[in-house]
Amino acid sequence: MSSCGNELISIIVPVYNVEQYLKRCIDSIINQTYRNLEIILVDDGATDNSGKLCDELAKLDNRIKVYHKKNGGLSDARNYGVERATGDYIGFVDSDDYIDAEMYEKLYEAIKKEDADVAECNFRFIYSNRIANYTEDNYYLILNRDEYTKEYVNMNRVFGAAWTKLIRSSLAKEIKFPKGKLFEDGFYSLELMKKAQSFVIFDSPYYNYVMRENSITNSKFNEKNLDLIEIADDIYDYVVSRYPYLKKDVARRKMYSYFNILDAIIVSPDYNNKLYYNNIKVYFHKNFLQLLINNKISINRKIRLLIMLINKKMYKKILLKHHRNLMGK
């Protein structure tokens, strides 16, 4: 089935040093069953052959527009693309990932049917040894802002990534990705959640998120990883102030973010800054009782918290084993 909707969808693809993955990504966009696309490739100062490959791909399909710019990071490249987008709707695809052929047709059908500001699908993690859907739930939900916030906080069916979404262009152009932030999607999703009025989300995993060991979000720890704590704190403060009945839920989400950073510090072989590690442990010590009695937090997670506070060496051993299994080593 092919779709030739009258409305134009602009797809923003930031490109930086991904020459071995880029063609697979762009082929998956070119082959979308929704044909009325504007494919914007933003070469963010790539130092490999990615920029040249963008130009070659543009010769094969007149829907592709290529822009070359100085390196400014992922957020800057996305903002650059959004500013130049002429579509009625805007979507994002990362250049080392790829999408199923029906993704934008189905997102467009949903956003039009429900007259929503944002449509969002499920996605898959693509590991070297396995494939896993973000959620196995079956759902098709039409949500207002308050209902979507609850889903976002609970992380059951809403991940918070830009690349699972189709967004009204007028809305997408109001929001900027924060330049220089590592977990830019979190900051962006929070602003989107504040501004959008209506959402439709469904369970089909059309986006394929490739877990590369040397990707930005899966590399050795550096201080930029602490951006995750900043956005976790921002989400917590916003939700508690506006939706106090979700305090336990958002406290759980905040705890997960702190755990993620603590784990990244522990598994990184070349990171010895004890200040950040100790600061994060202070958070867990300070909030230990509230986390322990929080009925939104699983028993397994509470056991993990106890092991981490009592025996760091044992916790690290368990964590490293889990990390190796996850990455297929």
Predicted segments with their positions:
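A conserved acidic beta->alpha catalytic loop
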Residues: 28, 35, 43-53, 70
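Glycine-rich, basic loop-to-helix element that forms the pyrophosphate-binding segment
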Residues: 69-85
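Donor-binding/catalytic cores of nucleotide-activated saccharide
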Residues: 74, 95-200, 210-223
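Short aromatic/hydrophobic "clamp" motif used to bind/position activated sugar donors
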Residues: 90
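Membrane-interface aromatic/basic loop that binds lipid-linked glycans or pyrophosphate carriers
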Residues: 269-329
